[in-house]
């Protein structure tokens, strides 16, 4: 008997994942933090096919850090999920290294097993001081606190949609090996120009499929202006969820590229003589379900707020 047959960790088809993640996002909009915590801790206790819970946070330079907690340990230690902040660039000095993670239960994503591994579920986390006060360099936490106050005091919800460009380059770990070989393009096509089954198109298709499974509301995807450059567009979300989308988008692209023997890089200017990569960000504000940037009778439909 093969060892793989002894394991029965959670692996969910992409179409089911999409439904689960969309429902989780809708649930997060309606339920409070305590209610979500009760629901998901109960689910984790019951779901025998989950082996680990992945918690994510970002450092001050935007790197995504991921810690896998054994499910049972996490459930027993929710008030004391410690990590060494001195090992994170720009965080605490060594003598103040004791930081905590607080699970943001509204951020749950049921992840494709072929991207993150079977038997895992992922949450973003807030970084906390030892006394569980918000850590000053947790910019996601700062954004979350600001938007919650904006909603509470003014009834305003902030939305964003990001258009993230990147390059697909030849070989795994190409960024780490740049000093040896530089970057090598995998496609000579340009804007909207890629044959249906060439390497860049296959990469875009696979990445977009994983994003859809994660609950991204995909709109369009295409090769960008420069050779080997890509962009995949998806719909807006509240700004905290939109920020999470940026990190997940990059994670998915990197994992997909790696599985194909290549590297997805989001460096702003990796090549001389051709376009670099950027990230247009579209913002809007909503109050009582209405876009307060819009006013039909004003010039160009723009309100005073805009």
Positions of the model-derived regions?
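Accessory "access/gating" subregions that flank catalytic or transport cores
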Residues: 195-200, 204-218, 232-239, 250-266
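Short, charged/polar low-complexity linear motifs in solvent-exposed/disordered segments
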Residues: 82-85, 236-237, 259, 283
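Glycine-rich anion/phosphate-binding loop at the beta-strand->alpha-helix junction
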Residues: 241, 246, 250-306
């Amino acid at each position: 008997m093969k060892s793989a047959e002894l394991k029965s960790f959670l692996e969910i088809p992409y179409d089911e994942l999409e439904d689960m993640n969309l429902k989780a996002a809708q649930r997060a909009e309606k339920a409070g933090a305590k209610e979500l915590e009760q629901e998901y801790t109960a689910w984790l206790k019951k779901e025998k096919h989950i082996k680990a819970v992945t918690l994510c946070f970002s450092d001050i330079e935007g790197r995504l850090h991921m810690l896998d907690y054994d499910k049972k340990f996490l459930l027993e230690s929710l008030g004391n999920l410690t990590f060494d902040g001195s090992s994170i660039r720009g965080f605490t000095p060594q003598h103040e290294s004791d930081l905590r993670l607080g699970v943001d239960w509204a951020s749950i994503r049921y992840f494709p097993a072929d991207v993150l591994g079977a038997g895992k579920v992922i949450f973003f986390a807030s970084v906390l001081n030892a006394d569980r006060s918000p850590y000053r360099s947790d910019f996601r936490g700062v954004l979350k606190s600001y938007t919650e106050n904006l909603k509470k005091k003014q009834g305003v919800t902030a939305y964003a949609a990001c258009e993230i460009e990147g390059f697909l380059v030849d070989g795994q770990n190409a960024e780490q090996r740049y000093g040896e070989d530089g970057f090598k393009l995998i496609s000579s096509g340009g804007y909207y120009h890629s044959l249906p089954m060439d390497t860049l198109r296959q990469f875009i298709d696979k990445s977009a499929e994983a994003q859809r499974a994660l609950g991204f509301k995909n709109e369009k995807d295409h090769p960008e202006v420069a050779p080997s450059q890509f962009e995949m567009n998806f719909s807006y979300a509240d700004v905290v969820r939109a920020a999470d989308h940026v990190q997940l988008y990059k994670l998915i692209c990197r994992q997909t590229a790696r599985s194909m023997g290549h590297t997805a890089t989001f460096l702003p200017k990796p090549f001389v003589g051709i376009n670099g990569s950027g990230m247009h960000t579209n913002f809007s504000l909503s109050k009582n379900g209405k876009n307060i940037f819009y006013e039909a009778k004003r010039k160009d439909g723009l309100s005073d707020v805009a």
